[in-house]
């Protein structure tokens, strides 16, 4: 009896635990070897090969002859030198500053800073340009002065205009976030943390290169019993920002190694279930950070009839499910949202599941636009490491990844 009581006491605490494969996968996706899964050192290509291997190890099959669907796009990459100093003080890339992703290669030595006050029209900036010398001057703008949405629209347009003729420094509140661009401006733009900025001599060096990049979506399936009557599709983008210079890389744990790891965990659990008339498809997209390019290409070049999809679940940013989960399109697909909420109430995985309307903010978008019923699910929390080098695997709750995988399996099983 004592042994039985001990077993009953321990069981509730052993239902969920971090799966060693989940830990291994997210650590590898976020490793230096994969270089932030971007466009330097073949980072995204290495990640694609790795994900395909994980699918194969689970016994999943390719949708066609290969796990890969290739496509291409241009991107501005930063494969080499990157430095920025003020009065001889070398700043830390990714922490103290970032180089705007549309910046070109450049070597700067500027002694004269020109501070521009807040303005409400792009024309106000253009009028000041003839008085400045791009070989001597660098413009400084304080982002915190541009508060409203209209102000920010004007600021973005002005930066693009200024960079045609002059290097620019944007002062940022805290660590600036980084992005990816497909274009190059004439002059570089730097975003610098205000707390480390000072007036003085600016010296900087950037190596940037526009490349015609070959990328691959990774597509796998769990075959149905006989001809599939319908398909359930899980998606997650695996690409991230890569490297900003050779020495600074963005691991992208929450965005979106967490979603890829969760998707593979879901595949592992479904693979153990008896085969049914449903075919399960798992797609790891490339090119999301550049503008949803991988999912757009798939929808335009589908490997199966999109009308056969009963439901699609896109997983993007899943490191904070201890706070909540939000379903984009939750206010549109009421039946599925109610099913997800009720399933979570039974399983007690996350404190709250919120709904919101449609939004073109992740890889579900082109499927939804094509008439596919779909959710984009993301976790809550303040996401304080968004697009910064501190988005690391150690901060993702891997026990919650396993719990969310069980939630997803039960949810789609009820559709």
Located regions from the model:
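Sec-dependent N-terminal signal peptides
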Residues: 3-13
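Boundary at the C-terminal end of the N-terminal hydrophobic targeting segment
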Residues: 15-17
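Catalytic-core environment of secreted peptidases
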Residues: 19-34, 39, 50, 54-62, ...
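Second-shell loop/turn segments in exported
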Residues: 32-42, 57, 69-72, 113-119, ...
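Noncatalytic luminal/extracellular "stalk/propeptide" segments of secretory-pathway proteins
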Residues: 35-141
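Soluble metallo-hydrolase cores and metallopeptidase-like ectodomains found primarily
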Residues: 110, 119-123, 171-252, 268, ...
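Metal-dependent peptidase/peptidase-like ectodomains
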Residues: 275, 285-385
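His/Asp/Glu-rich mid-to-C-terminal helical/loop segments that flank catalytic regions of hydrolases
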Residues: 384-415
């Amino acid at each position: 009896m004592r042994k039985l009581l001990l077993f009953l006491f321990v069981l509730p605490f052993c239902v969920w635990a971090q799966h060693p494969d989940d830990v291994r996968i997210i650590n590898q996706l976020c490793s230096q070897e994969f270089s932030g899964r971007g466009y330097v050192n073949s980072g995204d290509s290495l990640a694609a090969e790795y994900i395909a291997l994980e699918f194969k190890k689970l016994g999943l099959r390719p949708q066609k002859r290969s796990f890969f669907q290739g496509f291409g796009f241009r991107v501005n990459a930063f494969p080499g030198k990157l430095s920025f100093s003020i009065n001889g003080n070398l700043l830390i890339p990714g922490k103290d500053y970032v180089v705007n992703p549309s910046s070109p290669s450049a070597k700067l030595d500027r002694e004269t800073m020109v501070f521009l006050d807040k303005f409400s029209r792009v024309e106000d900036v253009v009028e000041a340009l003839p008085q400045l010398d791009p070989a001597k001057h660098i413009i400084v703008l304080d982002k915190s002065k541009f508060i409203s949405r209209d102000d920010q629209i004007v600021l973005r347009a002005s930066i693009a205009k200024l960079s045609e003729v002059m290097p620019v420094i944007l002062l940022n509140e805290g660590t600036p976030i980084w992005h990816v661009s497909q274009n190059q401006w004439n002059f570089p733009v730097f975003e610098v943390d205000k707390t480390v900025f000072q007036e003085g001599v600016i010296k900087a060096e950037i190596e940037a290169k526009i490349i015609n990049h070959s990328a691959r979506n990774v597509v796998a399936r769990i075959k149905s019993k006989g001809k599939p009557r319908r398909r359930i599709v899980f998606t997650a983008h695996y690409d991230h920002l890569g490297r900003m210079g050779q020495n600074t890389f963005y691991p992208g744990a929450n965005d979106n190694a967490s979603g890829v790891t969760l998707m593979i965990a879901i595949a592992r659990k479904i693979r153990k279930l008896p085969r049914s008339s449903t075919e399960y498809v798992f797609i790891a997209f490339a090119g999301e950070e550049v503008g949803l390019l991988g999912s757009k290409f798939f929808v335009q070049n589908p490997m199966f009839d999109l009308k056969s999809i009963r439901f699609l679940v896109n997983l993007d940013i899943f490191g904070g499910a201890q706070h909540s989960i939000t379903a984009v399109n939750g206010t549109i697909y009421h039946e599925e949202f109610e099913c997800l909420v009720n399933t979570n109430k039974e399983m007690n995985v996350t404190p709250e599941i919120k709904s919101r309307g449609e939004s073109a903010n992740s890889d579900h978008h082109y499927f939804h636009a094509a008439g596919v019923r779909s959710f984009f699910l993301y976790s809550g929390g303040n996401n304080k490491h968004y697009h910064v080098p501190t988005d690391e695997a150690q901060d993702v709750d891997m026990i919650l990844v396993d719990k969310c995988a069980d939630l997803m399996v039960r949810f789609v099983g009820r559709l």
